[in-house]
């Protein structure tokens, strides 16, 4: 499974244009849940599912052996980590070089990795995300993972004037790749809104605004929370857009 994913995964560089023609023909069902990403994806096993990985573009898998953020959880529960390790030179070393030569700052860039047929074989447990439970073999399922890093606003002194334009372009590339690869379901969420301190209101508004142009059957914003999601920025953004 890992060899197959590595053989078929690819990177889309910032400068690559993959615009998808806009022709809205599908009624999209939107869901906001408190689930974790793979927990949400499991409900659609058997469909072509894209899951957004809220990545760190310098460290492979974030800190998968001890931290408990979304990317680390994805890596511990699936075959994703060795696939990302295979992109060490083209993706991670590239970004180290760009940072060290000051060709890239905290805003990062639009590079992303598409990893198909990642096998999820452990439960994405909210009670103890560092030690997920092995699932029975018949419960395993596959997802397609899009690895893309949000701006690291936790180290920014102020928001640049083009902040929303950058976020919009990056989200559009994520959605374009998911659509081009014929995903029926996409699992999104509070991308970059944790440690990277991007504002949920902006991320939610731009996701919802752009998603109206795509033909996904189901979009689920999995917010990994025990709180009531009805008051979340994502629910409010959907209500404002009447979708």
Range-by-range predicted roles:
Residues 1-243:
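Macrodomain-like recognition of ADP-ribose-binding/processing modules
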């Amino acid at each position: 499974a890992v060899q197959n994913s590595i053989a078929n995964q690819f990177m889309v560089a910032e400068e690559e244009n993959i615009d998808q023609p806009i022709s809205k023909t599908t009624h999209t069902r939107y869901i906001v849940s408190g689930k974790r990403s793979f927990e949400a994806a499991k409900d659609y096993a058997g469909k072509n599912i894209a899951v957004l990985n809220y990545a760190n573009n310098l460290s492979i898998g974030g800190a998968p052996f001890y931290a408990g953020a979304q990317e680390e959880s994805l890596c511990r529960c699936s075959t994703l980590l060795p696939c990302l390790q295979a992109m060490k030179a083209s993706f991670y070393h590239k970004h180290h070089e760009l940072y060290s030569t000051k060709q890239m700052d905290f805003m990062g860039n639009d590079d992303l990795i598409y990893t198909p047929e990642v096998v999820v074989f452990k439960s994405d447990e909210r009670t103890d995300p560092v030690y997920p439970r092995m699932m029975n073999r018949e419960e395993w399922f596959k997802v397609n993972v899009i690895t893309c890093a949000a701006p690291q606003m936790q180290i920014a002194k102020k928001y640049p004037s083009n902040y929303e334009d950058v976020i919009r372009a990056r989200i559009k590339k994520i959605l374009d790749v998911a659509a081009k690869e014929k995903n029926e379901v996409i699992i999104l969420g509070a991308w970059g809104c944790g440690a990277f301190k991007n504002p949920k209101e902006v991320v939610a508004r731009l996701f919802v605004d752009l998603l109206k142009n795509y033909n996904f059957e189901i979009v689920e914003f999995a917010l990994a929370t025990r709180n009531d999601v009805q008051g979340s920025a994502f629910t409010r953004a959907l209500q404002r857009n009447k979708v």
